[in-house]
Regions:
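N-terminal "first-domain core" detector
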Residues: 1-44
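Acidic, proline/glycine-rich low-complexity IDRs
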Residues: 2, 99, 103-151
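Compact, glycine/acidic-enriched structural inserts
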Residues: 80-102
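Alpha-helix boundary/N-cap detector
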Residues: 5-12, 16, 81, 85, ...
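Low-complexity, intrinsically disordered regions in eukaryotic regulatory proteins
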Residues: 66-72, 96-100, 104-105
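Short aromatic-glycine-(Arg/Gly/Cys) micro-motifs in beta-strand/loop hairpins
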Residues: 40-75
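Hydrophobic, Leu/Ile/Phe/Ala-enriched alpha-helical segments that form helix-helix packing faces
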Residues: 17-29, 90, 94, 135, ...
Length: 151
């Protein structure tokens, strides 16, 4: 992990996360052929970047986007009033998705998988649940919401 006081290294890391966010939104056609505007709202240095994003031509459609040591993901901005609420929303969503993925793994037999690639969905579900617990703990800890942690 880089030095938390190295502003240049942090800017480079944050820029990389914002590029991943823009790619995520464009790949899902949420922002179509439009310049993506991304503004960081909160970070846990070198681990989590939470931002609001929108298209320059479609500023009325905003999204909360998360990236870093977690899956790049988004929610509509109306689902959370602030960064802390957005982080909690992602945590709940990932908990539910993790449980759903794990339960689906029990229902899939090897003969049902047409690909030679075998995915351990139980492990995927566990990983998603771990990420959810991590970000919920960050959202729940008052120390993470002091002004020194905001961008």
């Amino acid at each position: 992990m880089s030095n938390p006081n190295d502003k240049e290294a942090f800017r480079a890391w944050a820029h990389e996360q914002m590029q991943a966010m823009a790619k995520h939104l464009k790949s899902r056609s949420l922002i179509d052929k439009d310049e993506v505007k991304i503004e960081a709202r909160w970070n846990y240095p070198y681990r989590i970047l939470l931002a609001e994003a929108w298209g320059v031509k479609s500023a009325h459609e905003k999204f909360w986007v998360i990236a870093g040591d977690v899956p790049v993901d988004h929610i509509e901005s109306g689902l959370a009033l602030d960064a802390r609420a957005a982080l909690k929303h992602f945590a709940l969503r990932w908990q539910m998705q993790g449980a759903r993925v794990k339960s689906a793994d029990r229902d899939v037999t090897p003969d049902m998988q047409h690909s030679k690639l075998r995915v351990n969905w139980s492990e995927v579900g566990d990983t998603l649940a771990e990420k959810a617990e991590f970000i919920y703990a960050l959202a729940d800890d008052e120390r993470n919401w002091e002004s020194t942690m905001r961008m």
